[in-house]
């Protein structure tokens, strides 16, 4: 079973992430950041992973530490769940539209953390959610999952739609990248022999 549970406790946050890469898209979220809960649900549903995230953070200051640390813990859980990566597809990509918005996400489970995030949100806040936190979440995730991630919002006028297409496309690209390829069973998906 490709499952993981990671708990991360700091002076700023206490976070537990449980996930199953071979799930059905079920999720439970108690982060204290409602818009992030909505975005995490997009990852789970479109990635077909079961995801349970509990977080307590210093939200009396703002959501920065909580969102970043959820990304870190989620990345650690992903790395633990996919293990040595033998037999995985490794690469994943997706285009997702939502009305006027369109985003493209491309993933490489390379072991080399890197984020290329290209989005110009049409407003600075979605509800009470600072759009800068989208980048903080994905930076934390890629650094601890060891993946290269390219995110491009190709168009969009509604900031909620821009964010939602990014998270949906990430879920779908992740699903592709972590899918076992039966022709690669037991084989590392790299000419170097390691990732």
Curated annotation (Swiss-Prot):
Pathway: Amino-acid biosynthesis; L-histidine biosynthesis; L-histidine from 5-phospho-alpha-D-ribose 1-diphosphate: step 6/9. Pfam families: IGPD. Its main location: cytoplasm. The keyword Lyase applies. Keywords: Amino-acid biosynthesis, Cytoplasm, Histidine biosynthesis, Lyase. Its EC number is 4.2.1.19. GO terms for molecular function: imidazoleglycerol-phosphate dehydratase activity. It catalyses: D-erythro-1-(imidazol-4-yl)glycerol 3-phosphate = 3-(imidazol-4-yl)-2-oxopropyl phosphate + H2O. It is found in: Cytoplasm. Belongs to the imidazoleglycerol-phosphate dehydratase family. This is Imidazoleglycerol-phosphate dehydratase. The gene is hisB.
């Amino acid at each position: 079973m490709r499952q993981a549970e990671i708990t991360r406790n700091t002076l700023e946050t206490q976070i537990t992430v449980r996930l199953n890469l071979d799930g059905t898209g079920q999720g439970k979220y108690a982060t204290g950041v409602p818009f992030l809960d909505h975005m995490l649900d997009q990852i789970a549903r479109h990635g077909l992973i079961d995801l349970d995230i509990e977080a307590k953070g210093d939200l009396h200051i703002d959501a920065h530490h909580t969102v970043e640390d959820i990304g870190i813990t989620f990345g650690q859980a992903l790395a633990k769940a996919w293990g040595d990566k033998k037999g995985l597809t490794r690469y994943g990509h997706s285009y997702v539209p939502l009305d006027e918005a369109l985003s493209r996400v491309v993933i490489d489970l390379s072991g080399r953390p890197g984020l290329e995030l290209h989005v110009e949100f049409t407003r600075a806040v979605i509800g009470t959610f600072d759009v800068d936190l989208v980048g903080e979440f994905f930076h934390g995730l890629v650094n601890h999952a060891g993946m290269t991630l390219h995110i491009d919002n190709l168009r969009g006028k509604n900031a909620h739609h821009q964010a939602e297409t990014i998270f949906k496309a990430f879920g779908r690209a992740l699903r592709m990248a972590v899918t076992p390829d039966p022709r690669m069973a037991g084989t590392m998906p790299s000419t170097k022999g390691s990732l």
